[in-house]
Amino acid sequence: IPEASFYWFEDDVLCKCRPDIICKPQGPHQDYEIVVVDYKTTYSCSPESFKESVLKYGYAEQAAWYRRGMEAAGYKVKEFVFVAQEKKPPFASKVFKITNEQMDVAWLTMEEHLHAYMRHLKGEKPTVYNSPNVVTLDLDVQD
């Protein structure tokens, strides 16, 4: 299923996810199991480079968000994979996946962001505004 939108409520907040592709495994008793595929363009498909992109852009948290949306729709996400393709010739591509343990950590981070957003909607200012105006940075400078 390409680019289907899924909507659900978290308390009173309307939420949405739109995975690039949803694949349903073939076989009995697998009607609600799915594999979610997310397409990403990148400058390099090397594992080290794509890992940096995953960390920099929060792709793991996005995967957790999509999983949450799919579960709200009644599906069980069997696997989440990224199809990464380079932006320049030869347009190399590679498939990456995150482990269940990594997904669990991303899920917790995503939940923190969601709850912070819900608190913001109720009028609470983000914690960055509740901190001192002057913060001393501890820079680890090597000689």
For each feature predicted by the language model, list its residue ranges.
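Short, catalytically relevant binding-site loops at active-site mouths
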Residues: 8-9, 42-45, 65
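A generic structural motif
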Residues: 7-9, 22-26, 83-85
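A short acidic/basic microdomain associated with nuclease active sites
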Residues: 1-11
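Glycosyltransferase-associated regions of secretory-pathway enzymes
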Residues: 11-17, 25, 43, 131-142
